[in-house]
Amino acid sequence: MAKQIYDSMAMKRALTRMTYEIIEKNKGIDDLVLVGIKTRGVYLAQRIADRLKQLENAEVPVGQLDITLYRDDRHDASLAQDPVVNEADLGFDIKDKHVILVDDVLFTGRTIRAALDALMDIGRPKKINLAVLVDRGHRELPIRADFVGKNIPTAMDEQVAVYVDEVDGKDGIELKKL
């Protein structure tokens, strides 16, 4: 059975707070770009960009990052098929930019490690910060988020499910027992 952690309004408030934190920490939005990790990170990045536009009256580029080829588990025998790989083109140059990498859930850190590898293959940004909607702990790598919507301590037999309207038809965060 799933336990609701955030409804759509709480999720919106968390993203708004994260947006303010991004502005404050960076003293504005100069040279800022957002890169969402597919799939849900892309939609969260776009929502942050929309809020930045409302607050700062300026567009911030948003790109999407497919980390499929960079995952350290892609050769796992339990994966039934070869990965589908999309072009690694963000649509803008990240050289000397301040990149905010956006994802839905931070767990072991392996997805973020893969995303950092992918970003470095694309270009050399001036700085990279990490924004996640949920930090659930249980890190296997020394990775920490700079902007967090909600810290949710979890057990290993639990799963955090983030829903975004663009993919799932609703917004929210649930905690599920496996």
Swiss-Prot record:
Reactions this protein catalyses: UMP + diphosphate = 5-phospho-alpha-D-ribose 1-diphosphate + uracil
Stored Pfam families: Pribosyltran
One annotated GO biological process: DNA-templated transcription termination
Gene3D superfamilies tied to this protein: 3.40.50.2020
Enzyme class, UniProt record, top EC level: transferase
Residue ranges of the motif PRPP-binding: 99-111
GO MF terms, alphabetically ordered: RNA binding; uracil phosphoribosyltransferase activity
SUPFAM superfamilies noted in UniProt: PRTase-like
Keywords attached to this entry: Glycosyltransferase, RNA-binding, Transcription, Transcription regulation, Transcription termination, Transferase
EC id: 2.4.2.9
CDD domains: PRTases_typeI
Function: Regulates transcriptional attenuation of the pyrimidine nucleotide (pyr) operon by binding in a uridine-dependent manner to specific sites on pyr mRNA. This disrupts an antiterminator hairpin in the RNA and favors formation of a downstream transcription terminator, leading to a reduced expression of downstream genes. Also displays a weak uracil phosphoribosyltransferase activity which is not physiologically significant.
HAMAP family recorded: PyrR
Similarity comment: Belongs to the purine/pyrimidine phosphoribosyltransferase family. PyrR subfamily.
PANTHER family documented for this protein: BIFUNCTIONAL PROTEIN PYRR (PTHR11608:SF0)
The protein's assembly and partners: Homodimer and homohexamer; in equilibrium.
Protein name: Bifunctional protein PyrR
Source organism per UniProt: Ligilactobacillus salivarius (strain UCC118) (Lactobacillus salivarius)
Lineage: Bacteria, Bacillati, Bacillota, Bacilli, Lactobacillales
